[in-house]
Every structure is written in C-alpha cells, then in structure tokens.
Swiss-Prot record:
Protein name stated in the entry: NADH-quinone oxidoreductase subunit A
Organism: Paraburkholderia phymatum (strain DSM 17167 / CIP 108236 / LMG 21445 / STM815) (Burkholderia phymatum)
InterPro entries linked: NAD(P)H_OxRDtase_bac/plastid, NADH_UbQ/plastoQ_OxRdtase_su3, NDAH_ubi_oxred_su3_sf
UniProt topology in membrane: Multi-pass membrane protein
Subunit-level organization: NDH-1 is composed of 14 different subunits. Subunits NuoA, H, J, K, L, M, N constitute the membrane sector of the complex.
Amino acid sequence: MRIALNLAAYFPVLMFLLVGTGLGVALVSIGKILGPNRPDTEKNAPYECGFEAFEDARMKFDVRYYLVAILFIIFDLETAFLFPWGVALRDIGWPGFISMMIFLLEFLLGFAYIWKKGGLDWE
C-alpha cells in the first residue's frame, strides 16, 4: 500500500528556506559591496585583549587537548542517553534496564581502557 505524499503541505517550508537563504545572501552581499574596504597592518593583526601580540596567532595545539575534547564528547553523549532512559525506566521495564546496564558496562570498560593506557595523564 502506497501512502500519498501531499507536496503542497511542504510549500511553506520551501518558501521559508528560500526567503531565509535569499535574505542572508542579500544582506551579506550588500555589506560587502557598500562597506568600506581599507585594510592596513593593524586591522589585519590578531587582537589579544588590547596588548601587543606575544606570538603568532596560528600556534600549534598539543594533541592532548583534542583527546580530552573527544573523550568529553563521547561521555557527554552517554549522559544524553542516560536522561531519557531514567525518565522512561518504569515504562521500559527489565529489558530496558538490562540493555542500559550493558551499555554502561561497555562505557565503563572503555573508560578503564583509556585510564590504563594513560589517556587521562597530562604529563
């Protein structure tokens, strides 16, 4: 059985996207065309709170910052799964409880592995 798709219902969404995109492009273009363009060395220099720049703004970051960021995202997503599970725990019963405990055990094993490998050590 085929479900009839009424494309006319999506017309307001299409108009919203077209008008929003057109307005954004128009405003950026008008600012680029009419705005003054007088670059000099002071305008192109990186700004550091009113002080003279101590070093080049394009310095390299340590890889450990990226590792901490990735670990934060992973465990933040775990928390995002825990909140709805806690709210719906009475409705999903034992199968939902057991599946979430397996999920948490996998994350706990991953955390222990990261800790044992020294991924959380900063020295």
